[in-house]
From Swiss-Prot:
Signal peptide: 1-27
Membrane-topology descriptor: Single-pass membrane protein
Functional summary from the UniProt entry: F(1)F(0) ATP synthase produces ATP from ADP in the presence of a proton or sodium gradient. F-type ATPases consist of two structural domains, F(1) containing the extramembraneous catalytic core and F(0) containing the membrane proton channel, linked together by a central stalk and a peripheral stalk. During catalysis, ATP synthesis in the catalytic domain of F(1) is coupled via a rotary mechanism of the central stalk subunits to proton translocation.
InterPro entries, alphabetized: ATP_synth_B-like_membr_sf, ATP_synth_b/b'su_bac/chlpt, ATP_synth_F0_bsu_bac, ATP_synthase_B_chain
Lipid-modified sites (N-palmitoyl cysteine): 28
GO molecular function, one term: proton-transporting ATP synthase activity, rotational mechanism
Transmembrane segments: 49-69
Protein name: ATP synthase subunit b
Keyword Nucleus: no
GO cellular component term of the entry, any: proton-transporting ATP synthase complex
PANTHER family tied to this protein: ATP SYNTHASE SUBUNIT B, ATP SYNTHASE SUBUNIT B', CHLOROPLASTIC
Assembly description: F-type ATPases have 2 components, F(1) - the catalytic core - and F(0) - the membrane proton channel. F(1) has five subunits: alpha(3), beta(3), gamma(1), delta(1), epsilon(1). F(0) has three main subunits: a(1), b(2) and c(10-14). The alpha and beta chains form an alternating ring which encloses part of the gamma chain. F(1) is attached to F(0) by a central stalk formed by the gamma and epsilon chains, while a peripheral stalk is formed by the delta and b chains.
Domain of life, source organism: Bacteria
Amino acid sequence: MVKAKKLVFKWSLLVFSFFTLSLFLVSCTENVREIKSSSVINELFPNFWVFITHLLAFFILLTLMIFLFWKPTQRFLNNRKNLLEAQIKQANELEKQARNLLEESNQRHEKALIVSKEIVDQANYEALQLKSEIEKTANRQANLMIFQARQEIEKERRSLKEQSIKESVELAMLAAQELILKKIDQKSDREFIDKFIRDLEANETEDD
């Protein structure tokens, strides 16, 4: 389609240039007269040499027009075409780069979301682990304190029991000494023993 348009344009330019040059040459003749439609052909081609002259003038004019107008115009159009193609290519490259950057940005955003979620999950897991360790440590310490308290209570209890037994033995020895020294009768001995037992039971009750 483009080649056909160029060909039509060239032939149109050729015909227009030929008739323009012919009219110019006819108008420059010595006997200037009005050009009529019936005498145009005779004026243009009165003989063979005039025809050759017209043809040479036409080719000269065509050559000048090609070199002075057509080729510079073609160069300008080609340069313009190349510039537009370069701009389109650059725009496509920029669009491609923009799409790549957008895709990379989306990928980095998704990775950042994944990493942040992993960090939050890890922090929650570590917090739960720390809470569990603190609870276990607190339970161990509480159990240890309870055990130590029970040990202390049991130790105090044994100590009080041993002290009570020791005091009971000492009281019994004192009572025996008093019985021996006083040498009282059997009834007095019975009363003294009953009193000693009551005192011993009272001491044990106070210890408990």
